[in-house]
């Protein structure tokens, strides 16, 4: 299996969870030192696991990386598209360039990797796990650029799951809420409005994803109660928007 953004956070936690169950796991990321630390933990359980330093923002290099990873892993049967960046700014402070660069990393990159590996995944009856976000469903304040990338990834996943109906490929979308990762401390971002939401540890992601792989669940929320919140939003989107405006004003 291949986990992008595997040098820290959710990607590292998922990779370690899979390796602990005996899977051969490949991880990729930009920080070689962090990759080495995670790989050492993976190889304690799964000695054939490996890592690659790669910048998935380089869209033109993704196809070559996919071929390399596929060959060196002996075939990818589970692809976890986890790599991504935050971009917390109000729309008044966004530029087209910032929006496009965020979309490139969070949307176009996983799409290119998926398409490159799709023949192998179909051949191996594999799984595609796209790490989206609760932001794709709830559109939090100051997250327009980021939320749009995740909403695009979720919509892609829905259509892809139907398009692959005559294969045995499983498609899964995971919507984490607030997970204790670097995402909320990265520079060049406005402060996140998360004071009222409990941050979960990264390993809280492992069991829900493993269950989805086992039972075929398409969409997973972590924590689960955000499913009910999302359903409430879709029952009355206008009320949700007005309530979110009031919440944002209280934090201004």
Regions found by a protein language model. Give the residues of each.
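Conserved glycine-rich Rossmann-like NAD(P)H-binding loop of the short-chain dehydrogenase/reductase
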Residues: 21-38
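Residue(s) in the substrate-gating loop at a strand-loop-helix junction
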Residues: 133
């Amino acid at each position: 299996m291949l986990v992008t953004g595997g040098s820290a956070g959710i990607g590292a936690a998922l990779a370690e969870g899979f390796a602990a169950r005996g899977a051969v796991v490949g991880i990729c990321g930009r920080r070689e030192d962090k990759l080495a630390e995670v790989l050492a933990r993976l190889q304690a359980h799964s000695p054939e696991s490996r890592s690659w330093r790669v910048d998935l923002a380089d869209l033109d290099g993704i196809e070559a990386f996919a071929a390399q990873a596929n060959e060196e892993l002996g075939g990818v049967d589970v692809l976890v598209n986890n790599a991504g960046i935050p971009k917390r700014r109000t729309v008044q402070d966004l530029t087209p360039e910032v929006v496009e660069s965020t979309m490139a990393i969070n949307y176009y990159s996983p799409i290119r990797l998926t398409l490159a590996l799709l023949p192998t995944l179909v051949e191996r009856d594999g799984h595609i796990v796209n790490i989206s976000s609760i932001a794709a469903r709830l559109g939090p304040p100051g997250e327009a650029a980021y939320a749009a990338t995740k909403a695009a990834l979720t919509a892609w996943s829905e259509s892809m799951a139907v398009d692959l109906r005559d294969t045995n490929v499983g498609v899964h979308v995971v919507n984490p809420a607030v997970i204790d990762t670097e995402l909320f401390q990265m520079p060049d971002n406005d402060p996140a409005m998360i004071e009222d939401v409990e941050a979960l540890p990264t390993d809280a992601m492992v069991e829900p994803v493993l269950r989805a792989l086992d039972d075929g669940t398409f969409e997973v929320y972590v924590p689960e109660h955000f499913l009910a919140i999302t359903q409430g939003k879709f029952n009355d989107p206008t009320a949700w928007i007005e309530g979110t405006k009031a919440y944002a004003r209280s934090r201004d």
